[in-house]
Amino acid sequence: MIACRKSFTDTLLELARQDKDIVAVTTDARGSVTLGDFAKELPAQFVECGIAEQDAVGISAGLAHSGKKVFVCGPACFYVARSLEQVKVDLAYSQNNVKILGVSGGVAYGALGATHHSLHDIAVLRTFPGMNIVLPCDARQTRKLVKLLVDYPEPVYVCLLYTSDA
């Protein structure tokens, strides 16, 4: 069984090989998001921001505003807590074409403590006009979703729940 996050990033890499406008942005999470192969194979389409989620969202908005198809990827808890204002203003209100991939929602990162829990992501993001939210149920649905998202012109939050199959 393939985990949703692996399906997501494998499909994104496959599409990015053919479309130079696809860019992956991450925040020191290439391991947890499984973006290692993407970074190695397409370094010109990969942006590593370090532990700076607010900056990653701002950079993603700027790239999208210039015509790129941006996927900003990392733990769900940090995109909905640490960078909430940037998601609201730079993505939802501004309708920038950025897809947020939030991995390990809920209490999936349980051992890392409450700072890594994401219990409010869907509730909070539902209040933002123009923000779309999707939770694919398995790898097959995730693959189909990525193919649709590449050409979908609005901001989308994709929540992938944790599974132990990398």
Regions inferred by a protein language model and the residue ranges of each:
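Conserved small/polar residues in nucleotide/adenosyl-binding loops
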Residues: 162-166
